[in-house]
Regions:
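An N-terminal boundary/leader segment
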Residues: 3, 18-77, 302, 309-311, ...
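Gly/Ser-rich catalytic/binding loops embedded in alpha/beta enzyme cores
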Residues: 24-200, 218, 305, 310, ...
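Structural helix-boundary/capping segments
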Residues: 60, 137, 187-279, 301, ...
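Gly/Ser-rich, acidic/histidine-flanked active-site/gating loops
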Residues: 106, 112, 236, 256-338
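Selective detector of the "anchor" transmembrane alpha-helix that sits immediately C-terminal
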Residues: 573-592
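Cytoplasmic C-terminal tails of single-pass
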Residues: 596-601
């Protein structure tokens, strides 16, 4: 706790002394993408301001986190164009003009793809990766490229030529890897989404360690062209987000499929717990079966109770685990495929490095590539052995799903206590069922331990069953939601209560309860000038030095107008009553005169 307080003091010193950051009448760290677009509709944000607010967060905090390698210098200009198009034709879809951060092994035209190596700082791709093309078709803005474990080599950390990525919730701890920068960026609200890649656990492990959602889809469901490969037999690109609904929006864009993430329940769902992965069994031997960190067990068992109370049929698979499957899962083909894949990839870039050999020989490598270079020729015998193990494993898992009528298997993303930065541990990653079999799996926030460190729970289902997986994690999110902004990276500005109150007035419309006839009688209560003043306040929010006092003044003006109109209406009612009485008297008088006239005739 003392450490956190010291860091907080340091951060606030940074915030107050570096520059005056932009502000808005809404706190972007509390908004999902639907609320962001609504704020733009209400005039509280422009796309240009939105991008600036995210850039401010990167500037304020990232010197301590190292989550970002490069910024898209055209992001603000793209946002300005968005504002002009929005005024002219509206918004075509919910993702339009929203920012996303992508891992720096994914090609974005105009930005270097370094894979975490300064040796590739001049490697500019000739075209966007296929996934980037699809995001841009939706109108999204690539905001930045995220740091990663160099060449996607390590799961225990994200260390590259550009520094070590630190955990979003505690700088002394690891972000995990290799997509650590992407996970930390979303946790810190640098952007609503990020893309990462997953070979063995590279997307899901960092997501778990940073309290965000990391989705690995079925192998080959998403086109990976334009992504620097590690192991082409299991590499997958996927979305990282704070919520399930936001996650599905990105996966829909990348796959072309539609996923229903409306309210879902656990009713009728059978969720199988892999007890061996949860509790471990020392009789089997090996690090992979060591005892699980007690706080993970506590959080996991609490989550199971919540799922069961919500209607899930929880079953326990005590006999699922076999250590040979873990061995098969963690031996990737990266050593053989990486070399050939890079030699093909680099041809489509401006890099001075033209081969894997030259990359291995380059200075500044955090991790040696020579072992991979030595394996550049594929070992056919080893490949066949691995494929046979995978097929055996695949048949086994399919049999288990069918035997117990399972909808999803669930287990902790990791058994171990979160590692400190640069702490060595060879077995921290997610279990390799999903990558070795090409199955979809997602890491969801499990909760925080007694030190405030985040952990994840992983759900896995069968091939091409992303829809059911989204249904299950939607139900999970409803009963075990843990999203929160790291205390050491708070919002850069506060939204005063007066501004929130003024927004309520603005959104409900200025109502002074005047009948339409009043407009004929007087202009004293015309609300249009005040409406314009309020709209100008929100439009030019950053130009107002004291937004709290200005908002209070506008609220007072509105309330005064309401009070005066109420008094006017009361007086008017009295006048109307008198007019009615006078009219009745006149009618009675005229009626009597008419009767007298008739009698005379």
């Amino acid at each position: 706790m003392k450490y956190i307080k010291i860091v907080l003091i340091f951060f606030f010193a940074v915030i107050t002394n570096v520059k005056a950051y932009s502000k808005a009448p809404v706190d972007i760290t509390k908004l999902d993408v639907y609320e962001i677009q609504e704020a733009i509709d209400n005039g509280y944000l422009t796309y240009e301001l939105l991008i600036q607010l995210y850039l401010d967060r990167i500037e304020a905090y990232d010197s301590n986190y190292n989550a970002i390698i490069s910024i898209n210098e055209e992001a603000l200009n793209e946002a300005k164009k968005c504002d002009l198009e929005y005024e002219e034709q509206g918004r075509p879809n919910v993702l339009w003009c929203l920012p996303i951060i992508v891992k720096d092994n994914i090609d974005v035209k105009g930005m270097a793809t370094t894979v975490g190596a300064k040796a590739l700082a001049d490697s500019f791709p000739n075209e966007d990766a296929m996934v980037i093309k699809k995001l841009k078709e939706k109108g999204m803005i690539i905001l930045a490229k995220s740091n990663m474990s160099q060449y996607a080599f390590k799961a225990g950390s994200s260390v590259s030529s550009y520094g070590t990525v630190h955990n979003a919730y505690n700088l002394a701890y690891s972000s995990y890897g290799s997509s650590g920068g992407s996970a930390v960026a979303v946790a810190l609200q640098y952007a609503p989404f990020a893309l990462g890649t997953d070979t063995n656990s590279s997307l899901r492990a960092p997501a778990a360690a940073n309290n965000v959602i990391g989705f690995r889809s079925t192998l080959n469901l998403i086109d990976t062209k334009g992504i620097v490969a590690y192991d082409i037999t299991r590499d997958v690109v996927g979305p990282i987000s704070k919520s399930v609904a936001e996650n599905a929006l990105i996966l829909e864009t990348l796959t072309g499929n539609s996923y229903d993430v409306s309210d879902s329940t656990f009713e009728g769902k059978t969720i199988a717990v892999l007890d061996q992965f949860l509790y471990g069994d020392s009789s089997i031997g090996g690090i992979a079966t060591s005892s699980t960190y007690s706080e993970i067990v506590r959080l996991f068992e609490d989550a199971l109770i919540k799922m069961e109370e919500a209607g899930a049929n929880i079953i326990h698979l005590e006999d699922f685990y076999s250590y040979k499957y873990e061995l098969a899962g963690n031996n990737t083909m990266g050593g053989w495929t990486m070399c050939h894949a890079f030699n093909d990839y680099i041809k489509g870039t401006s890099s001075k490095i033209s081969s894997f050999y030259e990359l291995a020989a380059a200075s500044g490598n955090i991790y040696s590539l020579w072992n991979n270079y030595d394996k550049c020729s594929v070992n056919i015998s080893y490949t066949k052995t691995m494929e046979n193990k995978k097929e055996e494993y695949r048949n086994y898992v399919n049999t288990i799903f069918e035997k117990y009528a399972i909808d999803a298997i669930v287990y902790p993303n990791s058994k171990n206590k979160l590692l400190k930065t640069n702490e060595s541990n060879s077995k921290i990653a997610s279990y390799a069922i999903a990558p070795v079999l090409g199955l979809p799996a997602v890491s969801m926030p499990l909760g925080f331990d007694n030190l405030g460190l985040a952990y994840g729970i992983e759900f896995l289902t069968l091939k091409n069953n992303e829809q059911e997986l989204y249904e299950i994690i939607t139900a999970y999110e409803n009963v075990n939601h843990h999203s929160k902004l790291p205390e050491i990276a708070p919002a850069l500005y506060e939204v005063p209560e007066s501004v929130d109150k003024l927004k309520e007035i603005h959104e409900s419309g200025l109502k002074v309860n005047l009948p339409p006839v009043i407009k004929i009688l007087t202009d004293d209560f015309n609300v249009e000038p005040l409406e314009n003043k309020i709209a100008d306040f929100f439009l030019n929010y950053n130009d107002y030095e004291d937004v709290d006092e200005t908002a209070k003044s506008l609220i007072k003006e509105y309330e005064t107008l309401k009070d005066e109109s109420s008094v006017y209406i009361k007086k008017l009612k009295k006048i109307i009553v008198l007019i009615i009485i006078a009219t009745i008297i006149l009618l009675i008088f005229l009626s009597r005169r008419l009767k007298k006239a008739k009698r005379k005739n």
